[in-house]
Amino acid sequence: MPYYRRRVSPIKPGDPIDYKDVDLLRRFITERGKILPRRITGLTARQQRDLTRAIKQARVLALLPFINREG
């Protein structure tokens, strides 16, 4: 029977994901401004869904850029 390493979520299950917490949200977007997929972030499905909503809301409120044109 193969042994699979259990993945640990970078955000604790009870911690809220808020659109105002820009430092937390920046950890989950690329340098170009794209949202990282769940297989890279290691989040649960629920956390990834909440994170995506928070990032999109922060973009609409101009807390995060839609795209990053640096480089």
Curated annotation (Swiss-Prot):
One of its GO terms (cellular component) is cytosolic small ribosomal subunit. GO terms for molecular function: small ribosomal subunit rRNA binding; structural constituent of ribosome. Coiled coil: none annotated. GO terms for biological process: translation. Pfam families: Ribosomal_S18 (PF01084). Transmembrane segments: none annotated. Part of the 30S ribosomal subunit. Forms a tight heterodimer with protein bS6. Belongs to the bacterial ribosomal protein bS18 family. This is Small ribosomal subunit protein bS18. The lineage of its organism: Bacteria, Bacillati, Cyanobacteriota, Cyanophyceae, Acaryochloridales.
